[in-house]
């Protein structure tokens, strides 16, 4: 084996720098295969001519002896600066120069082993400062003559090198140098970050993320060169036993975020080296601290930058249109599909405008008067957002008398302001809250509704009008039409309106037109029926008809001194029967209304409800329960005896139950039916009174054979 000769004046420098301290037993690669026995001489610039060789092939590039890889040498801060030997003006590159490596292409291990580190010895011809003595100066930190290792990123930066933050910054390094300092890149086999983004470089949008790691693309895999040393291979196998957790964590993060991270965006985040050192010390130091710090940095980047950029990109791509405020007839655009964010404070929702069907000139209605027949057309989509929540009480059928009314409904005129001769048209029974109106009025009224519906106060007022079923929308529009119909409707209203409307409409009204409902002067005595009709009534039905007669005359609420509050919601009402006001102390409630508005009952025993009496302001503890009844239920309100006695309720009177929309409590009110003036309640007819009445009727109707036949039947039944 040949030995390595070094000039005397450069020997100390080589020994100090650890460059030429190799083992003589190892093989030295020469520039020529046939000149194996030549001695290797390094050029000495100190001036000793005996050691200067004038031939070009005496310059040696690198030697792979493990002993020359000294770990204390400074490192280059940037990977592009590490390159293989190149030719210079003074000493060209030798022919067939071979650079050896101490690693394999499939290994990734720690850099703590000096024998497994990468090193490149640059020739003296690459010195960026000409005419400088490399081997005689004694400065081992000169990057032109030192072995550089990429495994350690601890570098003494000075302003002349131009590395760091900007041009010449000294204390700020980029993120790749940061991860190198954290021993993230200390393996012999660097992973190629550009391979992760190889498919996304051309199509990735750089605006998809905010800030990621800087200069990841510059970390190109250093070409692995063929290793001819068996000893170095054994050292590599021993280093494979240590798993690099930091590299695995970082690589996993890159793979998970490769959809949103492009190679061009990995240049933006910079962290000072002093910050990394301080954070590592606070976390306890060592490799575990570096691993924890790496996870924190990656989590911070992903949470505060990647998601923020995604949110910004998403919001910029969405275009919002202002709320639909203009008249639909001025902008009949059938493709109004812009996204409008939903809002609870507005009564408008995104919908596609559809031209309305032809106007129905023969139909004018009101939100409160929904019991009038409506055309079987689907509601216009532009009106649907204006609708309030549907009424909680179920609508009755559109034909026939209402369930709680005992009077048939005569036909109504086309523009009748009363809608129903009984004075009640239902609680918004019309599913279309804003129905069809004449074309001349539709635009003005729609604009009025659009403006009023946009405020909360308007919604409150509209709900109050629905509860009272009296609205002022069409008062001025229908006055002229209603004046012609008032005279012919007064007789019908006098019979039924006063009896039913106040029961279902607990509203204080005045006779001077405080509301536009007409209250006629009700006669003290009901109209006399023909004698034949009187005699046709069976004796057993007289008691029921007599109890029904006072029901036609009810004291209005204004005479009882009670005014409804705006926050009360009508739930149900019940006309009291004999069993409800008897000694049982319970009132049977309507099944449908009870199931709809009162709390749901799971057990048969029911629940206790605190009912506040509106008239006396007293709270009654009543029990709400049900009885099973042939696969159905009968709902009861028990403990009502004291309430009935206090309010003096009798058969034919009724109760009304409300709920307070603000506090959720229940309120009950007993309404007495006014007895006709000069008329006393009838006592149950006795058998003697029945005989006398039948005898008098027989004397009156002696000249009527048909009447005698009619009267004979109930008389014979009574005797039997």
UniProtKB/Swiss-Prot annotation:
GO terms for cellular component: cytosol; nucleus. Residues 572-674 bind DNA. It comes from Arabidopsis thaliana (Mouse-ear cress). Participates in abscisic acid-regulated gene expression during seed development. Regulates the transcription of SGR1 and SGR2 that are involved in leaf and embryo degreening. InterPro entries: B3_DNA-bd, DNA-bd_pseudobarrel_sf, LEC2-like. Induction: Repressed by silencing mediated by polycomb group (PcG) protein complex containing EMF1 and EMF2. Ubiquitinated by AIP2. Ubiquitination probably leads to its subsequent degradation, thus negatively regulating ABA signaling. Residues 129-146, 687-700 have a biased composition (Polar residues). Pfam families: B3 (PF02362). Keywords: Abscisic acid signaling pathway, Activator, Cytoplasm, Developmental protein, DNA-binding, Nucleus, Transcription, Transcription regulation, Ubl conjugation. One of its GO terms (molecular function) is DNA binding. The keyword Transport does not apply. The truncated abi3-6 mutant lacking the DNA-binding domain is unable to localize to the nucleus and is an embryo stay-green mutant. Residues 122-146, 324-360, 675-720 are annotated as: Disordered. This is B3 domain-containing transcription factor ABI3. Residues 324-344, 701-714 have a biased composition (Low complexity). Changing residue 248 to T: In strain: cv. Cvi-1. Interacts (via C-terminus) with SPK1, SCAR3, ABI5, APRR1, AIP2, AIP3 and AIP4. Binds to BZIP10 and BZIP25 and forms complexes made of ABI3, BZIP53 and BZIP25 or BZIP10. Changing residue 231 to E: In strain: cv. Kas-1 and cv. Sorbo. One of its GO terms (biological process) is abscisic acid-activated signaling pathway. Signal peptide: none annotated. It is found in: Nucleus; Cytoplasm. Isoform 2 accumulates only at the end of seed maturation.
């Amino acid at each position: 084996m040949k030995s390595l000769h070094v000039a005397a004046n450069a020997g100390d420098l080589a020994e100090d720098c650890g460059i030429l301290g190799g083992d003589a037993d190892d093989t030295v690669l020469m520039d020529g295969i046939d000149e194996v026995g030549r001695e290797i001489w390094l050029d000495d610039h100190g001036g000793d001519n005996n050691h200067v060789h004038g031939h070009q092939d005496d310059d040696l590039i690198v030697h792979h002896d493990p002993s020359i890889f000294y770990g204390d040498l400074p490192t280059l801060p940037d990977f592009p600066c590490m390159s293989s030997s190149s030719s210079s003006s003074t000493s060209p590159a030798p022919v067939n120069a071979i650079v050896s490596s101490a690693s394999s292409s499939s290994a990734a291990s720690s850099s703590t082993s000096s024998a497994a580190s990468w090193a490149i010895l640059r020739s003296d011809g690459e010195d960026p400062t000409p005419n400088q003595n490399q081997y005689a100066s004694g400065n081992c930190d000169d990057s032109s003559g030192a072995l550089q290792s990429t495994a350690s990123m601890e570098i003494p930066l000075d302003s002349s090198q131009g590395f760091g933050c900007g041009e010449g910054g000294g204390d700020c390094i980029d993120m790749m140098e940061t991860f190198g300092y954290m021993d993230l890149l200390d393996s012999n086999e660097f992973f190629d970050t550009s391979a992760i983004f190889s498919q996304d470089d051309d199509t990735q949008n750089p605006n998809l993320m905010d800030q990621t790691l800087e200069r990841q693309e510059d970390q190109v895999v250093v070409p692995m060169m063929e290793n001819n040393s068996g000893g170095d291979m054994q050292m590599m196998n021993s280093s494979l036993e240590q798993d690099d957790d930091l590299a695995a964590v970082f690589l996993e993060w890159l793979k998970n975020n490769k959809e949103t991270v492009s190679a061009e965006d990995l240049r933006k985040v910079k962290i000072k080296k002093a910050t990394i050192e301080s954070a590592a010390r606070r976390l306890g130091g060592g490799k575990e601290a570096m691993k924890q710090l790496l996870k924190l940095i990656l989590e911070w980047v992903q949470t505060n930058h990647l998601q923020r950029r995604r949110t910004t990109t998403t919001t910029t791509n969405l275009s919002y249109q202002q709320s639909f405020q203009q008249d639909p007839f001025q902008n009949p655009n059938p493709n109004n599909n812009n996204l409008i964010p939903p809002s609870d404070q507005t009564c408008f929702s995104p919908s596609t405008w559809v031209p309305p069907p032809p106007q129905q000139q023969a139909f004018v209605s009101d939100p409160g008067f929904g019991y009038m027949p409506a055309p079987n057309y689907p509601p216009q989509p532009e009106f649907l957002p204006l609708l309030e929540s549907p009424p909680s009480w179920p609508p009755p059928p559109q034909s026939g008398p209402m369930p709680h009314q005992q009077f048939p409904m005569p036909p109504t005129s086309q523009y009748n302001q009363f809608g129903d001769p009984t004075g009640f048209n239902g609680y918004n029974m019309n599913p279309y809250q804003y129905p069809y109106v004449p074309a001349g009025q539709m635009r003005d009224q729609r604009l009025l509704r659009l403006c009023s519906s946009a405020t909360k106060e308007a919604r409150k007022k509209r709900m109050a009008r629905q509860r009272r079923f009296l609205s002022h929308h069409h008062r001025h529009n229908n006055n002229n039409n209603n004046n012609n119909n008032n005279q012919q409707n007064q007789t019908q209203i006098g019979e039924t309106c006063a009896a039913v409307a106040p029961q279902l409409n607990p509203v204080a009204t005045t006779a001077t037109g405080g509301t536009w409902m007409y209250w006629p002067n009700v006669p003290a005595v009901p109209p006399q029926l023909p004698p034949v009709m009187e005699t046709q009534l069976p004796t057993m039905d007289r008691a029921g008809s007599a109890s029904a007669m006072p029901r036609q005359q009810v004291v209005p609420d204004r005479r009882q001194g009670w005014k409804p509050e705006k926050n009360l919601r009508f739930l149900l009402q019940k006309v009291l029967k004999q069993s409800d006001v008897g000694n049982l102390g319970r009132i049977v409630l309507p099944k449908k209304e009870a199931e709809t508005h009162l709390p749901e009952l799971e057990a048969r025993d029911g629940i206790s409800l605190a009912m506040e009496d509106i008239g006396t302001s007293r709270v009654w503890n009543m029990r709400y329960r049900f009885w099973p009844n042939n696969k159905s239920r009968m709902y009861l309100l028990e403990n009502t005896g004291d309430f009935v006695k206090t309010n003096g309720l009798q058969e034919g009177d009724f109760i009304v139950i409300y709920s307070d929309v603000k506090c959720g409590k229940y309120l009950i009110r007993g309404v007495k039916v006014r007895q006709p003036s000069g008329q006393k309640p009838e006592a149950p007819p006795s058998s003697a009174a029945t005989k006398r009445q039948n005898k008098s009727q027989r004397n009156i109707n002696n000249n009527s054979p048909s009447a005698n036949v009619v009267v004979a039947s109930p008389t014979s039944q009574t005797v039997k």
